Design a protein with these regions (language model features):
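Extended hydrophobic/aromatic segments used for targeting, binding, or gating
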Residues: 5-26, 193, 200, 207-212
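Histidine-centered active-site microenvironments of extracellular/periplasmic hydrolases
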Residues: 1-2, 8-16, 32-89, 101, ...
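Long, internal low-complexity/basic segments
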Residues: 177-178, 183-184, 189-198, 202-271
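Soluble non-cytosolic domains of exported or imported proteins
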Residues: 10, 14-24, 96-103, 136, ...
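Beta-strand elements within well-structured catalytic alpha/beta cores of enzymes
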Residues: 20, 27, 44-49, 82, ...
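Short, solvent-exposed turn/loop segments enriched in Gly/Ser/Thr/Pro and often Arg
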Residues: 1, 47-53, 160-164, 242-256
Length: 271
C-alpha cells in the first residue's frame, strides 16, 4: 500500500488504519462529486472488497473476528463488507443477511441498465461489439430482491475456491461443507484434504470454532451427515457446467504443480 504523504502516520495505528483514513477521504470526494453533478439520485454506489484481511502482515494488514485470512477459505478469507446505496430502490438502513457474491453485481447492474436476461443470452451466444460471447455467468440478478419484489435473494449457495483454484468448500444457506481446510496464513498455509467433509452451521458457529474446540462436535456432526448428499449433488451440477462452458484460461497458481505441468506439456526446443 502506498499512501499519499499527508496520510502517513495519520492515525498512529499503522499502515492499515492510515490507508482506511485515506480511503474514507477518497470515497467522500467521489460522493461529493456525484452531488455536485446532480446525478447521485440516479447512481448505484457499491462499496465492498475482494477478500478478507491479511492478518499475517498485522499491524500493516487488517483484522477480523472470523477465522482465517486472505488466501484461505475460512470465513475470514472470504467474507467481506458489502454496502450499497441505490436511491428509490434500496431502502436506507436496510440490513440483509442473505448470501451474495461480487459475481452477482454484473447481472444486477445490467438488469438495472435495462437487460435482465443477459445471463440467459450469454449461454446461447450474445454479440457485443464485433465479438460474440457464449459463456456461463455464475452471478445472479438481485434487482427484483432490491426492489422488494422478492422476499429472499436468488443466491442460496456459494463455492469457496482458494488462490490455487481448488474447490475447498460449499455453503448452502446456513450450512458450510468443507472438503479441504487450510491451516496457517496465506504465506504458510497447508491444504489438507479431509477424509470426511467438515460440517459447520454458520448461524450457530459463525467463527468456525466448534470443529477444533468443542468436545461434542463429532456427536453433533453425526446427526448432520445428511448434508453430504445434497452437497454432492450441488457440486456435481456446478462442475457439469464446465463441460459445455470450459474455463477460457487456466487459473493462476502459487504452487509448483502448475509449473511442473507446464514443463511437461511444453515441447522441447532442442537447444
Amino acid at each position: 500500500t502506498r499512501l499519499g504523504p499527508k496520510w502517513e502516520n495519520k492515525t498512529g495505528y499503522g499502515l492499515a488504519a492510515d490507508g482506511m483514513a485515506e480511503l474514507d477521504d477518497v470515497v467522500g470526494k467521489v460522493l461529493k462529486k456525484l452531488d455536485e453533478l446532480k446525478i447521485a439520485d440516479n447512481t448505484i454506489i457499491v462499496f465492498t472488497s475482494d477478500n478478507g484481511p491479511e492478518i499475517f502482515t498485522w499491524p500493516d494488514g487488517g483484522n477480523t473476528p472470523f477465522k482465517g485470512e486472505k488466501g484461505t477459505t475460512w470465513e475470514g478469507g472470504m467474507r467481506v463488507p458489502g454496502l450499497a446505496r441505490w436511491p428509490r430502490v434500496i431502502k436506507p438502513g436496510t440490513v440483509v443477511n442473505d448470501i451474495m457474491s461480487n459475481e452477482d453485481w454484473l447481472p444486477t447492474f445490467l438488469a438495472a441498465a435495462g437487460d435482465p436476461d443477459v445471463k440467459a443470452k450469454l449461454t446461447s451466444g450474445m454479440k457485443a461489439g464485433d465479438r460474440t460471447f457464449r459463456v456461463h455467468l455464475d452471478g445472479y440478478n438481485f434487482m427484483p430482491f432490491f426492489k422488494g419484489e422478492q422476499a429472499e435473494g436468488p443466491r442460496q449457495e456459494i463455492f469457496y475456491f482458494d488462490d490455487n483454484a481448488s474447490l475447498n468448500a460449499l455453503r448452502v444457506n446456513d450450512w458450510k461443507i468443507q472438503f479441504k481446510i487450510m491451516e496457517g496464513n496465506i504465506a504458510s498455509a497447508l491444504l489438507k484434504p479431509l477424509n470426511m467433509p467438515q460440517v459447520i452451521n454458520l448461524r450457530q458457529d459463525p467463527f468456525e470454532r466448534f470443529p477444533s474446540e468443542s468436545q461434542m462436535y463429532f456427536r453433533w456432526v453425526g446427526d448432520k451427515l445428511w448434508t453430504f448428499v445434497p452437497a454432492q449433488a450441488i457440486v456435481g451440477q456446478f462442475i457439469a457446467t464446465f463441460n459445455e462452458f470450459p474455463p477460457s484460461q487456466k487459473s493462476g497458481s502459487c504452487s509448483v504443480d502448475q509449473v511442473l505441468d507446464q514443463l511437461q506439456t511444453t515441447p522441447a526446443t532442442g537447444k
